[in-house]
């Protein structure tokens, strides 16, 4: 009987760009020696839409609907960074009530993003049940968004100097009810997932990143905090009204996929604490800085008259961006989301550079998966939490 010769050469496999574990149109060219990963090369750009160039031909108000297409699971954060930049350039004050409403919406968006990370991440490593559970809570958040903004996703809710509309009657009570219910949901996830021996086998000690290594790679968000670095821009930059709430930065020191899971689960609990405090202490007053409507380029134009502004039509304000450079950032669910803005005395930005957290965090993937098993690629990629809309822009 002839025994077939065993081949020793390496095998090159394409994962994606339409693989169910890729979380978007990401392609990985993986070099395998049996089950062992020798090399991994991510191929990006399938979802590139020229978002930075589009910004250079739009006013800020015109550009707002575009930004929700970067990270389409946490759209409030892309809107927040878009209005924060001209607010800082023009030294525009945001009313206290608007600041509280923004914080509530941002933290609800953070929870929704973490939930839609948790479900597919668990499905990737073989646990199907949580995938259906997370949609139950996520639907409740989207119902709250729809009641306040009119849209479940792509809200277009933030405005320069405030928000588009005040919270509707009964919304605060409905949101407080959700917070009480969601805390029991998190406890349910902890029982179902955290101590599950099969889950621990798949994630414990997989994809370890040291603290110094995380800093050198420029990682941010849960990726950085899971490696022992207590860095959260809400505490570091003191933006918005976060200093008025009692909450803690969540971090772990192991740096593996389990640590990243624990950080995100704990962050959802902290977000609920922030939302509850904001809802109970929300002040009265305007939800928008109405003086912003006077910041039009043609200050003495007839279009600024009371009849045109408040009785007839409400044209979009065109803000003249002063000739200076500015970098602003927020703590998005996936990490540091930043905008580098250059103005040149025009209503259009001269340069609009996006610093997406997913793109920076994805850089470390090839190093993490080398010398690991093929099945660990799903675990590691899922624990990074990427959205290709913001990676490719």
Curated annotation (Swiss-Prot):
It is found in: Plastid, Chloroplast thylakoid membrane. Keywords: Chloroplast, Membrane, NAD, NADP, Plastid, Plastoquinone, Quinone, Thylakoid, Translocase, Transport. Its EC number is 7.1.1.-. It catalyses: a plastoquinone + NADH + (n+1) H(+)(in) = a plastoquinol + NAD(+) + n H(+)(out); a plastoquinone + NADPH + (n+1) H(+)(in) = a plastoquinol + NADP(+) + n H(+)(out). GO terms for molecular function: NAD binding; oxidoreductase activity, acting on NAD(P)H, quinone or similar compound as acceptor; quinone binding. GO terms for biological process: photosynthesis, light reaction. Belongs to the complex I 49 kDa subunit family. NDH is composed of at least 16 different subunits, 5 of which are encoded in the nucleus. This is NAD(P)H-quinone oxidoreductase subunit H, chloroplastic.
């Amino acid at each position: 009987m002839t025994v077939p010769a065993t081949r020793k050469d390496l095998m090159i496999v394409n994962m994606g760009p339409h693989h169910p574990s890729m979380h978007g149109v990401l392609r990985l060219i993986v070099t395998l020696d049996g089950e062992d990963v020798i090399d991994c090369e991510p191929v990006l750009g399938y979802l590139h839409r020229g978002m930075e160039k589009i910004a250079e031909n739009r006013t800020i108000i015109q550009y707002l609907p575009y930004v929700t297409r970067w990270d389409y699971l946490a759209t409030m954060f892309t809107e927040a960074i878009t209005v924060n930049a001209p607010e800082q350039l023009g030294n525009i004050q945001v009313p206290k009530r608007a600041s509280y409403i923004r914080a509530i919406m941002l933290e609800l968006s953070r929870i929704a993003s973490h939930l839609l990370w948790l479900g597919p991440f668990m499905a990737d490593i073989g646990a199907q049940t949580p995938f259906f559970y997370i949609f139950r809570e996520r639907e409740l958040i989207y119902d709250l968004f729809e009641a306040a903004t009119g849209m479940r996703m792509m809200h277009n809710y933030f405005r320069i100097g405030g928000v588009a509309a005040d919270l509707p009657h009964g919304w605060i009570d409905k949101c407080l009810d959700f917070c009480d219910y969601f805390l029991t949901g998190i406890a349910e996830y902890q029982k179902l997932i955290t101590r599950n021996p099969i889950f621990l086998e798949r994630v414990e000690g997989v994809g370890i990143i040291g603290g110094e290594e995380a800093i050198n790679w420029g990682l941010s968000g849960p990726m950085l905090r899971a490696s022992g670095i207590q860095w959260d821009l809400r505490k570091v930059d003191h933006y918005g009204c976060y200093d008025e709430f009692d909450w803690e930065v969540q971090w772990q020191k192991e740096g593996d996929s389990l640590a990243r899971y624990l950080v995100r689960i704990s962050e959802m609990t902290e977000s609920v604490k922030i939302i509850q405090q904001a809802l109970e202490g929300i002040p009265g007053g305007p939800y928008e800085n109405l003086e912003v409507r006077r910041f039009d380029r043609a200050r003495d134009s007839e279009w600024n008259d009371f009849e045109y502004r408040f009785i007839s039509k409400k044209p979009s304000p065109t803000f003249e961006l002063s000739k200076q450079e500015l970098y602003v950032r927020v703590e998005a669910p996936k990490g540091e989301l930043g905008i580098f803005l250059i103005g040149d005395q025009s209503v259009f930005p001269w340069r609009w550079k996006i610093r997406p957290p997913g793109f920076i965090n994805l850089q470390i993937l090839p190093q993490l998966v080398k010398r690991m098993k093929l099945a660990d690629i799903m675990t590691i990629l899922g624990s990074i939490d990427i959205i290709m809309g913001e990676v490719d822009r």
